[in-house]
Every structure is written in C-alpha cells, then in structure tokens.
C-alpha cells in the first residue's frame, strides 16, 4: 500500500514536470511573428556587413591608386624618357607630311571618328599613360602649337625636326658631353640659318603666288587654293576670311560688307559655353570708347538695359580693369548678359564717334530712353583670338561711303609715309568687306577635315604676305646644306671664342676650362642642326612611296640652281618655283626656331619630377557577392586592412558570419512598414558600426 502511494506520487510529479516543462519551453520559444522579425534583423545586419566590406574594399583599391609623393629622375634616364614621348608624337604626325601624306583616325567619345591629316590637331589628341613620356608629348604639343599660332602651318615639319634634333643631341649628351656648349651651338645655328632663309625669300607679288601657296598648304587641293586666292585677289592683302559650314556638298565663296581689325577676345573665359574657338553674335550693339573702363559703374546703365532685354553687347575700349572684367565674366557665365570685351590700345578707332563714359553716367535718364542712338550696331559680329570682324547692315552703306571719302581726303593731305600706309589699310578694310567661305562635304567627317585644310591654307597665305615665299618640298632646308653654310657657322663660333686681351674674356675662358673643348662642342651643336635639315625632304618622299635618302642625294649632288627639287605628284625632279611648289618663308622660319628651342630645353634638362602612381592590381572581385566572400575577403586582404586579431578568432568569426548568411538564404520574408524599417536602420547602423569596429577593425 505504501509502495503504491509512492508510485502514484512519482507519476503525479512526472506529469506535473511534463506539463510545466512544456509550458516553459513554449513560453521561451518565439512565435512566428517574432521569429520573422529576428531573422529579418539578422539578414539586414549581415547585408550591412557585406555592403560595408564592399565599400572598404573599393576604398582600399582607390587608396592604392592614389598619388603618393613624387618620382625624381636624373640625368640620362630623364632625357631618354622625354625623348620617348617626343618620338611618339613625331612618329604619328610625320605620316601626314607632304602632298602624299597619310591620314590619321581620331576616336571620339561621341559620334563617328575623325579622319584628318592636320598635324597640330593630331598632336593635341595624343596622351600617354606613362607620366614621364607624357611630359615629352606635352613639349611637342607646345612646339607645334607655337608654329600653328605664329605661322599657321608647318606643324608636321616642326614635330619631325624637333624629334630629329633632340635625338641627335641626347645621343651626344649621353656620351658624357657637356650639354651647355652644345645648346649654345644649336641656338647660334638657329639664328644664322633663319637670317639665311630670309635672304632667300621672295616677296608675294601676283595672284599666282597666292594661289600656289594656298594650294600647297591645303595638301595640293587646287580648288581650295583657287577659292582662297580669289578672296585675297578681291579684298587685298588685309582680307578677312571667315570659314563656315555649307549645307551643300560644294564649297562656296561669298563677299559681305564689313570691317575687321587685328584685335580679339580679351579673356578666354568669355568663350565659356560657346563650344568653339570664336564668338558669333547676330544683331549686336557696340559701345566704342577711347577711354579706359576702370569702374563698372561707368557702364552700369548700359549693362542693366541689355541684361533686361537679353540683347548682345560688344564693348570696344582702350583697356579694362580687372574689376570690370571679373564682373562682366561672372555675369556672362551666369547667363545674365551676352557681352564681349575688345581692347584696342589705340585712340583712332573712336576719334570721331567715341562715346564719353562720363557723360553717359551723368545722363542716365536720357540714356534709358535713347540708348540705341548712342551705340553702333552690326548685322553679325565674329570675334576670334586675334581678330574681330564686323558685318555691317545695308542701312549703313551711305555712312560708310561718307567715312571712306573722309579717309581718302586725309590720305591725300598727309605727308607721312606711315600715316599713308595706315589710312590706305583702313580704306581697303572699309571698302573691301569680308570673304566668307562656305565649306561643303559628303559627310560631317569630310567637312571637318576640309575645314582644317582651309585654316592651314589661309594662315599660310597670311604669313607669306608678310615676309614672302621660298621653294617648297624641303628644298630650302637642303640649300643650307648644299651651300656649305656650316662653315660660316663654325667661323662665327671661332670668332666668338678666340682669345683676346680683354681681361673679362680671359676670366670667362678660365671658368669654362678647355677652349678647344668648348669650341668643338659648340660646333657639334651646330652640326646637329644642319645635319637634321634633310629629314623634311626624306619624309615627304617616303610618304609618297619613294626612297627619301636617294632623293636627298640627287638634290644635294645636283649642279642646278637654287629651287631644284622633287615633285612627288609627277615623280620628277623640277624647278619647284616654276611648278608652283612654294612654302611661306614664315613657316620655314617657325619650324627652325621652335624645333631648336624645344631641343635646347630638353638637352639641358637634368632632372624630372613626376607624380608617383601605383599600377592597378585588378578590378573588383565578382565573388564579393557570394556567401563565402566574408571569410575569403578577410583572409586575402588581412595584412592590408591592418587587422591584428588572432587567426583562431578570425576563423570563428568568419564561420559565424557564413552560418548566419546560409540561414538567411533559406528564408524569404515580407517587407514591413517604412517607419519600422527606418527605426531599425537607425538602431542597426549603430550596432553595425560597433560590430565592424570591434569584430573586423575596418575603420582603423
């Protein structure tokens, strides 16, 4: 009986334990809603961890590629790196030299590629990843740009000549020769050769001379040459030529009444948002004064009216202060007003109709009502870097004719030769007008390529009118070699270095050391320049498919008079001038001058400092989105992320992360309300930052 009671008691206790134990377990177990919330929270936290790891991975790669200090290169290595960049530009640009020059295709970020043979445009588009070599590229771009700005042509010849002189000079410097006397020899040879070329020049006299220069400069396009020659034939040597696009496939020449003068845009910021290298406004008003505009208040009444009416305004003055320029530029950049500023540095332009700014400021009320009567106006205004063209309205033809008659009367009365020349130029400019060449083409690419040719040809003619012309095809360069001009240069060097009784010169000789060594090195520099003059003719022949070395030998060994050369179009040796193959003297001089200048600078460059940049070691790993990325990324980049945790702890943490991610991938959950998510994100961000700092140590 007793045992039975004990048995019953145990059964009751067991049942009670089962009952209450199940209840506790049930209470401790979360319901479905809580479990969804917890799992979603864990998923969000781990996604933030992965996102944070991605972000730090990218930051780490960006940090690797950031510039860290400077690389400093000395001596021969420095010059050799510059030479590689110079030769890179030369090897590309020289392919376009001559009437049989090849084309170069330029890839554009948008639109179809551009196929051209314009040397300066090709050089501008060359850029190398290697910073050291790219400095050499920039030097070549500077050389070609100067030739293009000063002479309008000869950029391909400049690039080739610069590379040749630089290469020969560096070869001598690398043999431990002193570059300073070599530089002196190069500079002296450059000056003497330029003077020699000027003595060989022939002035422009006839229509045929202009036609020949324009044809050669436009890559032997006779039709282009005729259009340009016709423009100069009608308007004279001071002709203003404007290039524009034509909807037709053919080129067209038009003449309009207008006036142009050699003054251009005062500040490049005025070109902002114009998408071209000049500004063109229609129905523009002009304010002309012979005063300096030093205070913005003096022209404020005009600016307010034109800003309100959104009309373009051109201000032509003697000079502008920095304050006025800054104010005008800022307002133009904001789009508040269309304004142009042109500096004349001269008083004649407004001697008759110039506006008195003091009277303008004192009579603001009257100006508000009749401002147009105080200002000039033009149908079209085109302002380039160094030239302004005003196309007048038909209604002003009577006033223009009256002004021309006044100038003619002044021309007859004056006795000064200088005044007669200037008055004649003004009469021609007012009466001649402006030539407008409308350029056609079968495609946009062809149209742009033809426009580059027209620019070269018009610039070449303009420079030739100033100095004259010489035989083309590189014959003038070969004449320097053929006439044994190097002996005159050597003689000049010896005369400059000969010993005299002058104490100052004796001290100089003591400083430079061996006189014979100094003399020989200067002669070496002169020899480098003269021996490089044949590369132009060689390359022209090579581009035409002929052996350039043989062509040069035949010309140098010929007993014909100056002008004998090779015509690649007919494959015959002819008199270049008689065949119309001529070059602008200014172009030839510019090639010699700029080539020797850049080469001299490179030879005396002993050190180069460039930004140091690490090479990119790869791109973002695609496995970054995989479940195993956390542990893989941590092991691979552990040493780069400055993580000092123990290896065992790393493995445990990575395994926990992987387990959490695997669990999360098995379930899909619904989105909750936006307010709840924002609250969770705020809390989780703090938790994540703490966990990232404590567990992964990324932010150190």
From Swiss-Prot:
Record carries keyword ATP-binding: yes
Transit peptide (residue range): 1-9
Ranges in coiled-coil conformation: none
UniProt keyword list: ATP-binding, Chaperone, Mitochondrion, Nucleotide-binding, Stress response, Transit peptide
Gene Ontology biological process: protein refolding
CDD domains noted in UniProt: GroEL (cd03344)
Cell compartments where the protein resides: Mitochondrion matrix
Compositionally biased region (Acidic residues): 644-700
A GO molecular-function descriptor: ATP-dependent protein folding chaperone
InterPro entries: Cpn60/GroEL, Cpn60/GroEL/TCP-1, GroEL-like_apical_dom_sf, GROEL-like_equatorial_sf, TCP-1-like_intermed_sf
Region listing for Disordered, in residue ranges: 636-700
A GO term from the CC aspect: mitochondrial matrix
UniProt record similarity statement: Belongs to the chaperonin (HSP60) family.
PANTHER family: 60 KDA HEAT SHOCK PROTEIN, MITOCHONDRIAL
Record's function text: Implicated in mitochondrial protein import and macromolecular assembly. May facilitate the correct folding of imported proteins. May also prevent misfolding and promote the refolding and proper assembly of unfolded polypeptides generated under stress conditions in the mitochondrial matrix.
Name recorded for this polypeptide: Chaperonin CPN60, mitochondrial
Organism this protein belongs to: Plasmodium falciparum (isolate FCR-3 / Gambia)
Taxonomic classification: Eukaryota, Sar, Alveolata, Apicomplexa, Aconoidasida
């Amino acid at each position: 009986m007793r045992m039975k009671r004990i048995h019953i008691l145990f059964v009751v206790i067991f049942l009670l334990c089962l009952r209450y134990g199940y209840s506790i377990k049930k209470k401790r177990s979360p319901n479905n809603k809580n479990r969804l919330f917890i799992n979603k929270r864990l998923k969000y936290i781990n996604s933030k961890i992965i996102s944070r790891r991605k972000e730090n991975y990218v930051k780490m790669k960006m940090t690797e590629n950031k510039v860290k200090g400077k690389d400093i290169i000395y001596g021969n290595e420095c010059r050799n790196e510059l030479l590689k960049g110079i030769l890179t530009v030369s090897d590309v640009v020289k392919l376009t030299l001559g009437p049989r020059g090849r084309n170069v295709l330029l890839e554009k970020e948008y639109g179809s590629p551009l196929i051209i043979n314009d040397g300066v445009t090709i050089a501008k588009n060359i850029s190398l990843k290697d910073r050291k070599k790219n400095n050499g590229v920039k030097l070549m771009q500077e050389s070609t740009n100067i030739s293009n700005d000063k002479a309008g042509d000869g950029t391909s010849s400049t690039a080739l000549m610069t590379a040749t002189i630089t290469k020969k000079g560096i070869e001598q410097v690398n043999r431990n020769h002193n570059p300073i006397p070599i530089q002196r020899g190069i500079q002296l040879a450059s000056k003497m050769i330029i003077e020699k070329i000027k003595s060989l020049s022939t002035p422009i006299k006839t229509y045929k001379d202009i036609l020949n220069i324009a044809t050669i400069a436009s890559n032997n396009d006779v039709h282009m040459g005729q259009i340009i020659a016709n423009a100069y034939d009608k308007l004279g040597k001071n002709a203003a030529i404007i290039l524009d696009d034509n909807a037709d496939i053919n080129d067209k020449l038009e003449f309009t009444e207008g006036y142009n003068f050699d003054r251009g845009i005062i500040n490049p910021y005025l070109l902002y948002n114009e998408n071209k290298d000049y500004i063109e406004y229609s129905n523009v008003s002009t304010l002309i004064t012979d005063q300096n505009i030093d205070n913005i208040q003096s022209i404020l009444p005009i600016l307010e009216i034109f800003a309100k009416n959104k009309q373009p305004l051109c201000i032509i003055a003697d000079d502008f202060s920095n304050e006025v320029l800054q104010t005008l530029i800022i307002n133009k950049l904001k789009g508040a007003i269309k304004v142009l500023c042109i500096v004349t540095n001269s008083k004649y332009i407004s001697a008759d109709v110039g506006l008195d700014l003091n009277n303008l400021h004192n009579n603001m009320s009257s100006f508000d009502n009749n401002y147009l009567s105080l200002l000039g106006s033009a149908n079209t205004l085109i302002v380039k870097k160094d030239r302004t063209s005003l196309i007048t309205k038909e209604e002003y033809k009577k006033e223009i004719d009256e002004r021309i008659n006044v100038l003619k009367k002044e021309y007859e009365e004056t006795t000064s030769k200088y005044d007669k020349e200037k008055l004649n130029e003004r009469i021609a400019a007012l009466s001649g007008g402006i030539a407008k060449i409308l350029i056609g083409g079968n495609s946009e690419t062809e149209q742009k390529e033809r426009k580059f040719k027209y620019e070269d040809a018009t610039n070449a003619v303009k420079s030739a009118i100033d100095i004259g012309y010489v035989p083309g095809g590189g014959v003038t360069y070969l004449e320097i070699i053929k006439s044994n001009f190097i002996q005159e240069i050597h003689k000049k060097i010896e005369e400059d270095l000969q010993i005299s009784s002058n104490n100052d010169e004796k001290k100089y000789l003591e400083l430079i050391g061996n006189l014979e060594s100094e003399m020989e090195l200067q002669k070496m520099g002169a020899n480098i320049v003269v021996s490089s003059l044949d590369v132009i003719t060689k390359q022209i022949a090579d581009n035409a498919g002929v052996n350039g070395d043989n062509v040069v030998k035949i010309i140098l060994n010929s007993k014909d008079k100056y002008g004998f050369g090779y015509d690649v179009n007919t494959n015959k040796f002819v008199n270049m001038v008689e065949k119309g193959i001529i070059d602008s003297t200014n172009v030839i001089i510019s090639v010699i001058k700029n080539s020797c200048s850049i080469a001299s600078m490179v030879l005396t460059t002993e050190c180069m400092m460039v930004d140091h940049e690490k090479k990119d070691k790869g791109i973002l790993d695609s496995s970054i989105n995989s479940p195993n990325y956390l542990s893989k990324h941590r092991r691979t980049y552990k040493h780069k992320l400055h993580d000092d945790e123990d290896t065992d702890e790393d493995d445990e943490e990575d395994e926990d992360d992987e387990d959490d991610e695997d669990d999360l991938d098995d379930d899909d959950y619904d989105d909750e309300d936006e307010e709840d998510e924002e609250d969770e994100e705020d809390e989780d961000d703090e938790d994540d930052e703490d966990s990232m700092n404590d567990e992964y140590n990324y932010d150190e």
